[in-house]
C-alpha cells in the first residue's frame, strides 16, 4: 500500500465499504477496485490487504467462502450482519475525522 499513513489507518473502512457496495469480493479483486477507484494513486499490496481482511474476519465483521474458478480455488469475503453495522460506524468516524482536519488545517472541501 502507498506509504500514506492516512490511508493505512483507513484500510478497514475502505474494505468494509467496498464489500457493502459489491456484496462479495476476493482479495485481488479488492486491490484492483481500489486501484481503479483511485485512478491508480492507491496500490494495495498483499502485505497490507490480507492482514486487514484477517483482522476483520477475526473480529466477526467478515465471513469467507471458497469457490473454484478456472480450476483455482478463490476465497471470497463478504460482510456479516455485524460487519454491515460496522460500515456505517466506520464511515461516521471517517467523516468526523475529515471534518476535523478541514477545520484544523483550514482546508476547503475538494470539488471534483
Name each model feature, range by range:
Residues 4-5, 61, 112:
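Short, contiguous hydrophobic alpha-helices characteristic of membrane insertion segments
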